[in-house]
Structure formats: structure tokens, C-alpha cells
Amino acid sequence: AKAAVNWEKSNLKQVLDRVDANGDRGKVTFFLENWFTGAADRWNADLDNYYLQLAAYMKSRGYRYDQWIVHCFDEVLNDKFLNGAKNIKRLDPQIRIFSDPPPATAEQLRPFLPYLDCFCLGSWFLQEDANNGNKAVELLRSTGKPLWIYECDSQPRHPLNNYRRMALNSLQRGWDGFTFWSLTGLQFRHASITPPEGVVNYGMTYLDENGVRYPSRRWALWELGIDDYALVAALRQKGIDVSGEIRTMCGTKDAAALDEAMEAFKKEKLKAFIPGEK
């Protein structure tokens, strides 16, 4: 018999316990990232054991399959990933698998579609695909599976205009979400990683000498984007179409102008949720 995974000493247990302690169960989807799957020379019995026990553990904690997803290959579409995804689905077809693919053609993506459950596309993927007629994005949209947009780094030198606008970019496309990969910055997550010379990879928060973390202006704007996204989603649930307004705001050129436009939009559209207002 295969050895049992000691979940009692795992980071996963700590995270699940913390979510329960905060009263946040049901409010989050767990993104279960591991690198040992991709690092293995080939698929093996230990991986079989891990994924079967992972599914059993999440079930024992009261979580449905739609409340967690596995990320085990990063920015690749290679044979090892395809084989790994097939094996995970062989073990348990309900385990969901996440992908943040590199720029790819529809033909490169097609073999993966039966095995992957959520796609998160970087701006570089979208730019290259736009040059090729948007065929890859059209293929992914045809699956009906969740589509997100993301950026990797968040640096102080990047235009502030990028941060609130990301929500509008996702909304305009009719997609399901948006995120930054590095919310805290690589050197804060992994002390062994040194950014290339000239790159200040701080994410969107800062850590002081006492271990206290502070948000940046970039974080504040990204957080406003989350509010924008939630408002538009609520309006759509009411059957209120704001596609034209979203397109107009996406064309706004700088952060200050976008902020002014969005605040006016919110002030007007929030009336839809006030009894007696129109």
C-alpha cells in the first residue's frame, strides 16, 4: 500500500484552517500549485498516490471539486503536461486543471482542451494571437470553460493606467476574471530569486523591517478594478447592458481620466440597487 500523505503537517491544511477561522469558507477558490509534478522525469505511482489522496482530503474537508483547482505546469504546452493532465483525469475526471499557456496556435492548444478546465492568458498571448486572427482565443472561447487575463510582474515604473483597466479588459471580452501573478513580488515570496538587473519586481505591496506589509498605489487601483468588476457583474445579473460604457472607458488613455470616468459610472449605476431610484 502507498504511504498516506501527512496532510496534518501540510501548508494546505494551514491555509484551509485559516480560511475557516476567518469565516471565508465558500468565498474563495483554492489554487493548489505544485512543482513536483512537472519536475518528475515521468509520471509515476507516487503521483497517482498524491492526486488520489489530494481529492480525498479536499472531500474530507467538505470542499467540492468546483472549489479548488490544480496548477502543476507553468506557461508550457508540452508533451509532459499533456501526459500529466491525461493521467490526472484518468485517476479522477473531476479534478480540475489550470493552465496559463504561452503564446500558442489553435492547433497547439487543441489536444489539451479535453483535459484542462480553466485558461488564464497573458497580454503577450493576446497580442500574438491578435496578429494571427485571434484563432486561439476563439477556440478557447468555444469550449465554454473559464477564461481569465493576467500579467506577471507589477513594477513601480509600470503605468498606473494598467491596474484598474485590467478589470475592464476582462469585462469587455466577456471573460471570467483577471489577476496579477506577483501580488507580493518574487523576492518576498522566494528569497533565492533575484530579479534581473534593472528590474524592481515588488509586486503590489511593500514589506517593512518589522514584517508589516503595505499596499501600493498600484494595489489600490487594482482593488478598485475588483469593485468595478463586481458592479458590472451585478448589473448584468439585473439584465442591464453596459457594454457600450465599458468600451468607452477602455479607450480612456490615462489613470486619472479612467478614475474620473469610472467613479461617474459607479455613481450613476449604483442607483439600480437603491429602491425607488432609476
Residue ranges of each PLM-predicted region?
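Catalytic domains of carbohydrate-active enzymes that cleave complex glycans
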Residues: A1-A4, L12-W43, L47-A104, D176, ...
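Short amphipathic alpha-helical segments and helix-helix/interface helices
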Residues: K13-L16, L82-K86, L109-R110, G133-E138, ...
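Short, acidic/polar
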Residues: E8-V15, L47, P102-F112, P159-L168
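Catalytic-core region of carbohydrate-active enzymes that cleave or remodel glycosidic bonds
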Residues: L113, C118-P195
